[in-house]
């Protein structure tokens, strides 16, 4: 239950989909950024992976002036490679893109630390687990560096990590910079997605599923582990609806501390003739694709 509403001085939000349009989380973050930017101005920082190296990213507007002194310090003193600029969306919030490639050399040591401190099982990792985890850990190191260089213990800072891909960074900050409050937000559980993706009835039998057992059955142990352990160890665990909260209770053995309902700006859905025109064009495209599949 929420007893008090406290306003932080600084907000750091980490996601694999910052300046990297992949799916629904990009929409969630980008369509509320304007409201956050209005409230917090340039004390709001989004952190994403620098996966467009050597290519022009239309979603990222790089700046040589933003955080210039810290960026130089992060490179020379903390061995971190970052690019700073603005997200090319309404509100234009500050973005820090992180090059995480150098952390692969420390992967085994990082995973060992996470097992010893938080019992995160990375032994069964495959696919995108390593890449996401190295980004997540690097994002945590970046926030630590920024905090040590620019802020003091009197500054109230929050780190919000979205989805299992950013869990490692949140756990790192729990011990490295406990002054920063950590929030972990799941938009749908990884094991829930896997259950549904394997054509099993998720919600009809949700009460009967054991998350750990299903993770083993579906070869999802590591992703499930980082998600579950992050949910249990961060300062505040949140999800985006009562439906996903039911997933969390059953599959992660942890109900959300707060349910943060998804929201978007009033102008997200076009109005009037603009909406009608876009609807017609979208329908035409869908019919064209469907006809080609016949």
Identify the meaning behind each predicted range:
Residues 1-294:
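Catalytic cores of nucleotide-sugar-dependent glycosyltransferases that transfer UDP/GDP/TDP-activated
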């Amino acid at each position: 239950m929420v007893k008090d509403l406290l306003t932080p001085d600084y907000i750091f939000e980490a996601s694999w989909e910052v300046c990297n349009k992949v799916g629904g989380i990009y929409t969630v973050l980008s369509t509320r950024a304007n409201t956050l930017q209005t409230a917090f101005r340039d004390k709001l920082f989004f952190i994403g992976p620098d996966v467009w190296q050597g290519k022009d990213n239309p979603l990222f507007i790089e700046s040589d002036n933003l955080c210039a002194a810290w960026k130089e310090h992060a490179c020379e003193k903390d061995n971190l490679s970052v690019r700073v600029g603005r997200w090319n969306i309404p509100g234009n919030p500050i973005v820090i893109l992180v090059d995480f490639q150098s952390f692969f050399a420390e992967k085994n040591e990082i995973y060992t630390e996470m097992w010893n401190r938080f019992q995160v099982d990375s032994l069964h990792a495959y696919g995108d687990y390593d890449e996401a985890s190295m980004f997540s850990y690097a994002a945590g190191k970046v926030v630590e560096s920024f905090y040590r260089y620019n802020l003091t213990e009197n500054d109230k800072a929050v780190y919000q990590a979205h989805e299992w891909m950013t869990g490692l960074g949140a756990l790192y900050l729990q011990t490295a910079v406990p002054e920063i409050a950590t929030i972990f937000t799941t938009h749908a559980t990884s094991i829930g997605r896997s259950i549904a993706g394997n054509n099993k009835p998720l919600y009809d039998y949700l009460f009967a599923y054991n998350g750990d057992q299903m993770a083993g059955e579906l070869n999802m142990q590591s992703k499930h582990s980082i998600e579950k352990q992050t949910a249990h160890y961060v300062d505040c665990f949140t999800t985006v609806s009562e439906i996903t909260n039911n997933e969390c209770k059953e599959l992660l053995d942890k109900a959300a501390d707060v349910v943060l309902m998804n929201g978007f700006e009033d102008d997200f859905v076009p109005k009037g003739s603009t909406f009608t025109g876009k609807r017609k064009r979208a329908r035409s495209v869908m019919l064209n694709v469907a006809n080609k599949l016949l």
